[in-house]
Amino acid sequence: MAMETERKISIAKAIIEKAIEVSDKTKHDVFVDWAPHVQWVEVAIYLGGWKTGKNEYEKFTISFNRNTENVFKACMARLNELLTEAGNDFCD
């Protein structure tokens, strides 16, 4: 069964908002890409920031056709973890 448009938008908004927050409040860069032809949102997390030629990153592919909720929750948990770690850096 196809996911409803409203739910897709809700998931995409949540990811983009969190990606902006992580990119603004930490040393990490988070890229978000929507691929309509395959119905997924791809999230790439460059720990320590993006640099030319840097190929090491964490990737989450949230497919709206399968395993959406599990991957979405894992992605959001990782982004929240990075924010929490950044907050703890200020306490040192």
Predicted regions and their residues:
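Negatively charged, low-complexity tracts enriched in Asp/Glu with abundant Ser/Thr
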Residues: 1-42, 49-92
